[in-house]
């Protein structure tokens, strides 16, 4: 394989040596498996959790293509510089495409992918930053790049395993730390989303260690594999359209303020009201204000199901905007704050903008003490489970792209219908899609009309069950 146009003489020698090495490893694997099968099967399990079937996937350093094939892509392209590896990959996985190419030069690839995988590849590269820079033209704005790479703590253990012929031989590695890779990603135009550790015991009978202990400190510090997910640094979106969805139940006295106080955002904006079996005249109040504000684009739907989550889903289904916003009808989150959420999403600061009530001091009656402590506990628990900081899980104001909500809804059966609020349905779904979640602090105000529709103790117990559920479905998998 020609490398003289990419590197100086030292780089060329490095590449030639590594190509010859991996060609030899490919031939060796025809009659030898070692003990690495347990490790690679666990890697495949992790990637199948991260990537749903039917995605467009590029794997760089694909070897014999087993990981790529296990993900059932709609379009699977594997790249490797070892001709011997690719010969075997094509024989094993005829439905996938395999191309001999160098990770440092992807100019021959002219299509974007949903996911790009570097599985135990990054530590074997001559110039990591250059390889990362090559990714820009094969990325869409929503592309996710997933890396897994050995921890430097395992250098001696892996060297011993190779000497005992239990693991495939490796040439000297870069032994990057997660911090090293984050820095290089930033230089290459990418933004890390989250990182974590996997696999304590890459041998038989490792289930408990690899699915439970590795999630806990201090055991996670000794894991074999570092994982990191990144996205392209975003470009601002110019003037998207906006739908503000308001679920209203027993909020008649707040409707006028919503019409009068909600600022205009985006190229076009609509208010989408979903009225939920009110005991007061909320529905009629919305109709009156719609008639009184003919210049506002607004629509009203009567909820057929029960609960806020059901109302929000109906509103999102009916919404026409590119951007979906939730505004609580009690206006305890001021409508005047919505442009901050809009701008954070439009500018690419995050893909799921989550309101936070717990940063600024609150009004005296805005949130009772037990509710405040409960929200603090739940935010800490869910931040740990999801791997991204979420300071307030039950602030009603959340903003995301409609296209991303469509993906959340399409994958909702993974979690099931468990959330009466709708907050966790969206948060879990966003985390499962590896969306960038960003907290946006707001000042939480006192109610000026009505009383809360939340039953503190009943819903608190439900949320405890949801923590256990989320831990099983997201953390300990």
Question: Where in the sequence are the language-model features?
Answer:
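A conserved acidic beta->alpha catalytic loop
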Residues: 275-284
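Acceptor/aglycone-binding surface of glycosyltransferases and processive sugar-polymer synthases
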Residues: 154-169, 174, 303-318, 326, ...
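A short glycine-rich, Lys/Arg-flanked "PGG" loop and its adjoining helix->strand segment in the class I
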Residues: 129-144
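Conserved class I S-adenosyl-L-methionine
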Residues: 2-52
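Conserved donor nucleotide-binding strand/loop of the catalytic core
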Residues: 99, 283-318
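A conserved beta-strand element that flanks and buttresses the S-adenosyl-L-methionine
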Residues: 117
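Hydrophobic helical membrane-anchoring modules
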Residues: 2-5, 210, 214-242, 246, ...
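Class I SAM-dependent methyltransferase SAM/SAH-binding core
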Residues: 63-105
């Amino acid at each position: 394989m020609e490398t003289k146009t990419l590197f100086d003489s030292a780089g060329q020698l490095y590449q030639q040596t590594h190509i010859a090495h991996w060609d030899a490893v490919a031939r060796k694997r025809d009659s030898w498996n070692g003990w690495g099968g347990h490790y690679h099967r666990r890697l495949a399990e992790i990637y199948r959790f991260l990537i749903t079937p039917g995605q467009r996937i590029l794997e760089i350093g694909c070897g014999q293509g087993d990981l790529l094939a296990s993900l059932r892509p709609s379009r699977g392209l594997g790249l490797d510089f070892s001709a011997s590896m690719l010969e075997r990959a094509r024989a094993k996985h005829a439905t996938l495409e395999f191309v001999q190419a160098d990770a440092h030069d992807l100019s021959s690839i002219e299509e974007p992918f949903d996911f790009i995988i570097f599985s135990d590849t990054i530590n074997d590269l001559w110039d990591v930053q250059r390889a990362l820079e090559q990714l820009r033209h094969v990325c869409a704005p929503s592309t996710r790049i997933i890396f897994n790479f050995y921890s430097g703590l395992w250098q001696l253990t892996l060297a011993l395993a190779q000497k005992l012929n239990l693991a495939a031989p490796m040439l000297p590695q870069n032994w990057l730390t997660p911090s090293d890779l984050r820095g290089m990603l930033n230089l290459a135009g990418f933004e890390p989303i989250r990182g974590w550790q996997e696999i304590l015991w890459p041998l038989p009978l490792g289930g408990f260690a690899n699915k439970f202990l590795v999630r806990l400190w201090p055991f996670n510090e000794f894991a074999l594999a570092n994982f990191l997910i990144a996205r392209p640094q975003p470009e601002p979106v110019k003037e998207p359209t906006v739908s503000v969805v308001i679920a209203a139940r027993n909020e008649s006295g707040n409707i006028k303020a919503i019409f009068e106080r909600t600022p205009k955002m985006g190229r076009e904006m609509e208010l989408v009201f979903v009225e939920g079996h009110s005991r007061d005249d909320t529905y009629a109040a919305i109709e009156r204000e719609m008639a009184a504000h003919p210049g506002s684009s607004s629509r009203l739907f009567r909820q057929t199901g029960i609960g806020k989550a059901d109302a929000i889903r109906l509103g999102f289904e009916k919404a026409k905007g590119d951007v979906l916003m939730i505004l609580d009808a009690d206006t305890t989150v001021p409508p005047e704050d919505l442009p901050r959420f809009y701008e954070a999403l439009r500018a690419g600061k995050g893909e799921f903008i989550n309101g936070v009530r717990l940063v600024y001091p609150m009004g005296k009656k805005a949130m009772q003490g037990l509710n405040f402590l409960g929200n603090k506990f739940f935010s800490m628990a869910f931040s740990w489970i999801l791997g991204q900081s979420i300071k307030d899980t039950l602030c009603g104001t959340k903003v995301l792209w409609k296209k991303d909500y469509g993906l959340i809804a399409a994958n909702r059966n993974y979690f099931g219908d468990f959330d009466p609020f709708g907050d966790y349905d969206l948060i879990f779904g966003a985390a499962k899609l590896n969306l960038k979640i960003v907290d946006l602090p707001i000042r939480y105000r006192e109610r000026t009309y009505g009383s809360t529709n939340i039953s503190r103790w009943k819903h608190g117990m439900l949320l405890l069950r949801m923590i256990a559920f989320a831990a099983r479905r997201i953390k300990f998998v």
